[in-house]
């Protein structure tokens, strides 16, 4: 009896929190408009530079190191991961067809047809997938490697 009531309360909470998340523009109200800013570190140029340097680093590192060393294997995992994430994000864009913030003020515009490919972010997926193999491989030995996780966070903020 006690267990059934506990499960019922969990279900009720899930329904209430789901409704609140939907009403608030996504989970925890995170899907809302923010001020557009292209100055300083938020400029589009910096984001493109980050993506280009990430590509050059993982591709160059993989070719330079080869696949025999620990570092070389990690570079090749990053290349594989980045390619897979790019393909998956592109497929997701065509499946979801979400409008960009510049196209609408409503964050719930999904399945809008051709030209609406805001989500998922291919650039954030690329950066995330490129650093993840390094975090997994070296994070426990060198905790500073976890700081690489700031790159996708930065990239996702700049994308807005």
Annotated model-derived regions:
Residues 18-20:
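N-terminal signal peptide c-region/cleavage motif recognized by signal peptidases
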């Amino acid at each position: 009896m006690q267990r059934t009531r506990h499960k019922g309360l969990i279900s009720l909470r899930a329904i209430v929190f789901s409704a609140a998340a939907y009403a608030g523009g996504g989970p925890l109200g995170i899907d809302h408009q923010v001020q557009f800013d292209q100055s300083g570190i938020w400029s589009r140029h910096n984001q493109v530079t980050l993506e280009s340097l990430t590509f050059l680093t993982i591709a160059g590192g993989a070719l330079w190191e080869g696949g025999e060393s620990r570092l070389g294997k990690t570079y090749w995992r990053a290349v594989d991961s980045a390619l897979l994430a790019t393909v998956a994000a592109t497929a997701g864009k065509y499946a979801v067809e979400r409008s960009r913030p510049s196209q609408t003020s409503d964050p719930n515009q999904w399945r809008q047809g051709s030209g609406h490919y805001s989500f998922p972010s291919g650039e954030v997926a690329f950066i995330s997938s490129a650093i993840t193999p390094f975090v997994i491989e070296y994070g426990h030995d060198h905790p500073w490697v976890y700081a690489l996780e700031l790159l996708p966070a930065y990239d996702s903020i700049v994308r807005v």
